[in-house]
Amino acid sequence: MITSETVYHFVGIKGSGMSALALVLNDLGYQVQGSDIDQYTFTQRDLEKADIKILPFSADNLHEGLTVIAGNAFQDDQIEIKTALEMGLPVVRYHQFLGELLKNYTSIGVAGAHGKTSTSGLLAHVLSGVAKTSFLVGDGTGKGIKDAQFFAFEADEYRRHFLAYSPDYLIMTNIDFDHPDYYTGIEDVFDAFQSEAYKVQKGIFAWGDDPELRKLKSNAPIYYYGTKSNDDFQARNIQRTVEGSEFDAYYHDENIGHYHVPLYGEHNVLNSLAVIAVSYLEKIDGREVVRELADFKGVKRRFTEKKVADVTIIDDYAHHPSEIKATLDAARQKYPDRQIVAVFQPHTFTRTIALMDDFAASLNLADEVFLTDIFSSAREKSGKVSSADLGAKITKGGRVLKLDNMSPLLDFEQPVVVFMGAGDVQKYEYAYEELLSNLSPKDN
């Protein structure tokens, strides 16, 4: 039960989902604080703007009157969680708490191996523009409105955590093999999504080209979206330009509108179509959906752009072969005449080993590829693979960059440099930006 008679203490408050949930509760008027590592993270700014107290990890943070919300990155032996359990304080996991909170709203989740954050951010933006909407997005963005009609949220499949949710609607962007430290293969991933499908109340929106999603069964209706004639919701007459993407949306043979989105890549056409489908079934005015889609600015760490000197730098969270392919496709659409240089930080040893050939194939879609050392997770500090092993399979380069020497990236003229990864790849990006800013102008 969620109550105002306690202070909610978030262990790992800087995590993307945790920070978003903390912001939601704070907006709803509950007392919120949290703890985490000292290192600055991109989620921290919004917490600070909301005056939410962030403490360093310490058992001294725990006292009577707290309810502990434990981040899923931490086990029960983490010092604060362990202390809270010993003190008899209520301890609830992030996904369990969110599952309880969602019961108060018409909840619309977004699940999938890839595209969750981009789609949930787009969904939250559109719904917020037309109705009172609370939302929780995986880029650390969260908003709570007490009398909201909708709650848009990201539903993470890792360790089957999304089984804590019984949403009214669920968008399923795809099923793919990821998280090899937990899932044994694609069949195991499908089993998780199938279990969640039975928990959906009103309707599922699933990408029609995904063979795994086509096998789903549910007590709720399943609406497929895509570009094929057998999809319930279809995007037709797609035009992808340097200004973004536009298309006509159809529900069966009914034209429900012409839409423009300032987004790039085929995946963003599909993400937009899924949001249109939800809006259509909830009888939201189509003209308002057109307006909101055209005004979307994107989410954090998803194709985030900046210009330094004559270089365009793109920062993206892509850390799976399918995501890399989508990000590079988007870069090609927006910059068809520029050289695309990829800088990829492999994320975890298990994922790098399990998907190495697929990583190489996706990265080869760039004009030139650089790698950083593998980013290890808290669950695995070492492994029997290196970035050089991946680099050996890449035909478009594959050199390993070191943080203290980013100069190999200077060999390109007016490039689009795409930094990708789910770890701390941004430190390489910042080092490159500093190098560029320190360069003297060329002599005439």
Curated annotation (Swiss-Prot):
InterPro entries: Mur-like_cat_sf, Mur_ligase_C, Mur_ligase_C_dom_sf, Mur_ligase_cen, Mur_ligase_N, MurCDEF_pg_biosynth, UDP-N-AcMur_Ala_ligase_MurC. GO terms for cellular component: cytoplasm. The keyword Cytoplasm applies. Pathway: Cell wall biogenesis; peptidoglycan biosynthesis. It catalyses: UDP-N-acetyl-alpha-D-muramate + L-alanine + ATP = UDP-N-acetyl-alpha-D-muramoyl-L-alanine + ADP + phosphate + H(+). Its EC number is 6.3.2.8. Signal peptide: none annotated. Cell wall formation. The gene is murC. ATP binds at G112, A113, H114, G115, K116, T117, S118. This is UDP-N-acetylmuramate--L-alanine ligase.
